[in-house]
Curated annotation (Swiss-Prot):
This is Tryptophan 2,3-dioxygenase 2. Gene3D superfamilies: 1.10.287.3810, 1.20.58.480. Pfam families: Trp_dioxygenase. It is an enzyme of class 1 (oxidoreductase). Belongs to the tryptophan 2,3-dioxygenase family. GO terms for molecular function: heme binding; metal ion binding; tryptophan 2,3-dioxygenase activity. Heme binds at residue 303. InterPro entries: Trp/Indoleamine_2_3_dOase-like (IPR037217), Trp_2_3_dOase (IPR004981). Binds 1 heme group per subunit. Homotetramer. Keywords: Dioxygenase, Heme, Iron, Metal-binding, Oxidoreductase, Plasmid, Tryptophan catabolism. Substrate binds at residues 36-40, 107, 317. PANTHER family: TRYPTOPHAN 2,3-DIOXYGENASE (PTHR10138:SF0).
Amino acid sequence: MKPMSYWDYIKVEELLALQGGANGDETQVGNDEALFIVVHQVYELWFKLILRELTFARDLLRQDTVPGHQIALGVRSLRRAIAVFEQANQHFRVMETMTARDFLDFRERLMPASGFQSAQLREIEILLGLEDNERIAVCQGGSFKDALKLPNGALSSAAYRVEAREAHGQSLKHCLYAWLSRIPIDGSNEPAAVKRFLRDYIGSVRAESQRRLQTAIDRQLAPAEVERLRARYQADDVGAETFLLAEEDPQADAMTREKRRAVRAAMLFVESYRELPQLAWPRELLESILELEQSMLIWRQRHARMVERIIGRRVGTGGSSGVDYLDQTALRYRVFTDLWTVRSLLLRKSSVPPIRQGASYAFAEEALV
């Protein structure tokens, strides 16, 4: 085996030969088009890293038993994916060194190509757990998969990648929720124990609302303002109970509601009693999941603002509504909605209900779930 050089190991020669544009001739590519190509190639490499880290975290949570030290490894992978998204955000600044006129000089050569055809970005969405019925149509009435097809309707290599990802296995969300449903709530996984904890917590939520209302009264707020707060707190209390007891969907069967209660109770339990040793890493995992989704939402928003700054609100090269579509994805593409909702229900430490089996969450060698 010959000695390895940096140039050969990184395959720089091959990388530097990939900026030839539509005709494969780099001599015909101007500096602005070269910038466009390189930045998007770098994005695809970042997406590859994110997919690797998310797959690792998903596979870890897919195990029947997840040892505590492995949760730390999952957190590390999620934090790396977060760091990659944050770094990718900086690349939009490089793109913004290109003016609208610069881009328009070569934009028509891209048609009907579109960033929407990034199979790896679609893979990230699928791996996270974005459902088909939650997607925004890229064109009038069209499936996101239609945009990945070749002009003649045949499947492209990008379409095959997405199909393979869908067939490969469960999403990170599915595995996370399955893992959460196994976390003992106050020492027990029994549905009755879960419901008892939730009832106790709902009682604490209502007591906290009453305390806040009394504070408003004591500070001599105007009667109309007090009544407005009273109505708001009552609505919040009803919403909290409906969510925690999984009663928001009257069509859901008893088993579905039971599973939702277990997951939501676990989210609330881990966040509320995070000082307990065995809940420390689970809490870091949930925090990392939220930060991951936040970093992707920020990336989507930054992407939309970069596009708007350069070309305004033109129709996209692939026929989409352009910036309007990008803005909608930034607003509506939320995967871990229950985690975000739980943040609205957290109480200060002195207000959370006491638990009976706190000692069972002390340091131990065995896995929590």
